[in-house]
From Swiss-Prot:
Presence of the UniProt keyword Ribonucleoprotein in the record: no
Key word Signal present: yes
Keywords of the record: Amidation, Cleavage on pair of basic residues, Neuropeptide, Secreted, Signal
Protein's name according to its UniProt entry: Pro-FMRFamide-related neuropeptide VF
GO BP annotation list: negative regulation of gonadotropin secretion; neuropeptide signaling pathway
InterPro entries given in the database record: FMRFamide-related/fGRP (IPR026297)
Location(s) in or outside the cell: Secreted
Disulfide bonds listed in the record: none
GO terms for cellular component: extracellular space
Organism: Bos taurus
Residues modified to Phenylalanine amide: F92, F131
Amino acid sequence: MEIISLKRFILLMLATSSLLTSNIFCTDESRMPNLYSKKNYDKYSEPRGDLGWEKERSLTFEEVKDWAPKIKMNKPVVNKMPPSAANLPLRFGRNMEEERSTRAMAHLPLRLGKNREDSLSRWVPNLPQRFGRTTTAKSITKTLSNLLQQSMHSPSTNGLLYSMACQPQEIQNPGQKNLRRRGFQKIDDAELKQEK
């Protein structure tokens, strides 16, 4: 790979810049060289012959009159409401029953006033589970409530609840150095007995 000398690089840059500036000046009409006159330039710049462009056609007043009946403007469709309730939002006295039927009320969510017991089971589909069983929302809630009740009656849960409810040992025996809660001490003692 050759290294270009500084003189050659400067010559290359000057030649490139002179070519670019000459092209810019030639495109400008005010700086056109004297070889061609402006008349010749205008003559050569016009397109020769018919290149397939159609002449633009101007419209007459009669044609514009003929178009008027063909164009029909449709009025916008507006839902008519009684004038007393037209500008009032729902919280200022319009009732839901006036504008909506009871059938439309059936599809509203709970936060908008729909109160039905089977709404959860209706919206949760029956999905096939393992071994071909199908579960519904009611059976899922039953299972969860049964698990919660079973866990509440287990001995480890009772011990934890007891330890949370009892008072700290420092309040009961202020002279003792061991400041652990009595419930945790009982659980630790029970674990030591099980390990032996």
